[in-house]
Amino acid sequence: MVSVTHCDSLWFGADIITMRGGNYQLIPQGAIAVTGDKIVWIGPHAELPPIHAARQVVYEGGLITPGLIDCHTHLVFGDDRSNEFEQRLNGVSYAEIAANGGGIISTVRATRQASEQQLLEQALFRLKPLLAEGVTTIEIKSGYGLNLESEIKMLRVARRLGELLPIDVKTTCLAAHALPPEFIGQPDDYIDVVCNSIIPQVAVENLADAVDAFCEHLAFSPAQVERVFLAAQKAGLPVKLHAEQLSALRGATLAAKFHAISADHLEYATESDVQAMANAGTVAVLLPGAYYLLRETQCPPIDLFRQYKVPMALASDANPGTSPVLSLRLMLNMACTLFRMTPEEALAGVTCHAAQALGVQQTQGTLETGKLANWVHWPLSHPAELAYWLGGQLPATVVFRGEVRP
């Protein structure tokens, strides 16, 4: 290890949960030395070598965790769908709402009509509660434009959010989210547009870090998704997939075939799907908010993910229809309560495994030397409290790239 004699800032006085290896890996009364935006030393304060720090910050107890990562959101969209919330409470299914012109398509209309500035202002409003909870990295998908102009518009807004606020934003092109109204009955023709026009242009403009698709009976078939993935490969972009949310189509196996960085939802994933994901290194992104709001009854196969050592990430799935959730902390509790995950698994799901689901595990997700100085200081005594408490207990301090975030 390189000897450290100087640093920009030294932080100590709290217990540190590093999440190395997906476990708490507690450092009692730890210390973190930072130079620039990187951690240059971390360990017990009692073992701190002689380091000259330009600035010292002393915490009075509490817990430090890695900055939270929300690895699956649809945060940029026009309007909301609160009327559909009422419909679902009256027994109308998600599929029925979509068949009657609601669902994703109603948001597509609103998103196409909105200006870039309007979308930006609405997204800023939605993003700020997540920042307040300690989210330091977020993924934002397109998928409500469904034509070249509007998909580009959404991705530009997502990139702009990362320029305006102290948060890392990863963007995903989800043009294969639903069939736009002008292509009803012509899904293959729309996939032509996605593959030959939208994905190449998004790649040219460097607006996306990955490509996603929705593999489901009410969206696109595995064969159509495979075409999207081939186009993404040609453009040099990694892939992700909404898979097995409402039915078993072996989408997760298809995702694994293309070494997708994640497959998401997965309520209907089979053992063979999970085996394929394990072999490919594909992360399972679980979305308890959508499960809860849709009042689903089939849980993702948590025991199979454990058995085959598939990393489990968690995310808000913030979107206007099926998961209008602006709290990643709430997802920790839901994952434990609804899916029977442990608090330790849940915290790994919004730190190290979420980083892996975005392909940023080399720089984020755990607290260790060489990684970004992103962390959250909580006024808590045990990490399980992050999943235990519903509401309240906002972070005392969020540090983003070595600086206290206002």
Curated annotation (Swiss-Prot):
Pathway: Amino-acid degradation; L-histidine degradation into L-glutamate; N-formimidoyl-L-glutamate from L-histidine: step 3/3
Binding locations of Fe(3+): 72, 74, 242, 317
Residues that hold 4-imidazolone-5-propanoate according to the record: 81, 144, 177, 245, 322
EC number: 3.5.2.7
Function in brief: Catalyzes the hydrolytic cleavage of the carbon-nitrogen bond in imidazolone-5-propanoate to yield N-formimidoyl-L-glutamate. It is the third step in the universal histidine degradation pathway.
NCBIfam families per record: hutI (TIGR01224)
Compartments where found: Cytoplasm
Gene Ontology MF terms: imidazolonepropionase activity; iron ion binding; zinc ion binding
Organism the protein comes from: Yersinia pestis
Residues at which Zn(2+) binds: 72, 74, 242, 317
Catalytic reaction(s) noted: 4-imidazolone-5-propanoate + H2O = N-formimidoyl-L-glutamate
Cofactor note: Binds 1 zinc or iron ion per subunit.
EC primary class: hydrolase
Keywords: Cytoplasm, Histidine metabolism, Hydrolase, Iron, Metal-binding, Zinc
HAMAP family recorded: HutI
Family: Belongs to the metallo-dependent hydrolases superfamily. HutI family.
A biological-process GO annotation: L-histidine catabolic process to glutamate and formate
Primary localization: cytoplasm
Cofactor names: Zn(2+); Fe(3+)
Listed name of the protein: Imidazolonepropionase
UniProt-listed Pfam families: Amidohydro_1
Residues involved in N-formimidoyl-L-glutamate binding: 144, 319, 321
